[in-house]
Amino acid sequence: MRFLPVRALPKPERLRYLFSFDFDDTLFTLGGPAEERSIFFRTMRMLRSQYGVLWGVNTGRDPVYLREGLADMFRDDAEAFAPDFTVTMERNVHLADAEGRLMPGAAWNDDCAVAHDSLFTRYGGMLESLMGQLESRFSGLGLRRQGNDAFSLVVDDAYGLDEVSCVIQDTVGPYEEIVTQRAGPYLRFSHRDYNKGTSLSFVASRFGIPSSHVAIFGDGHNDLDAMRHLPEAFRCCPSNAAQEVKDMVARGHGYISPEPRTRGVLDGLAHGVFPYFGMKAEVLKEDI
């Protein structure tokens, strides 16, 4: 993550708030208007200087795929600056160093790797058998094999994961250490102790920011862990969010935007986050 075209800004004198954004279909709209991205960065610059707000991306993308996405988001935008943190694959943490480069959160990532190596060593045979059964049972399902993500899959239709997830749960339910992370048409097996929620808690603790000063933006099933794990945080989702996410937002301190994706983030800042935290701020917009 250190080779991004732009770097994070110097830290504010006082770190007061932490805003965490899911990437795909929340913060980033593929092919979306460049003006929306520019509005976001101008607004975050203002919040940083006036209210000590840090921000980051909390995603299921792997580091390489996120780097590509961030490069698209930064392209041709003079206001763009890198996030203060990223969480990739729902579990691997990178934090901006003094020079604004995103560097691995060594202790957390090392412990995470050990936990997953142990998990997949002990249960790899069972998971291999399960994935073979899923591949033969469900059309349009593909297995994804990567060195850092050995047990994951993708389906043609995100809604098809409902039935797939039920079959998976019947098999892995008795194994408390094994959970699944689901985002759109993607699903991966992982260790229960490492998810968007526990990763975000680690990030907040490193910055010394209490969970009551955290805002979580997300649209997918894997965002539920963050909202559950930090119940005092403010929650926000765009209109395209999964129904389970909307239900979670409605049950806590939160705001469901009537706008989708990036527009939903900008609307959520203006009509959700700012009033909740008492920020006398506005989204620096023209027309969105």
Predicted regions and their residues:
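Non-catalytic pre-domain segments flanking phosphatase-related domains
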Residues: M1-F23, G31, I39-S49, I288
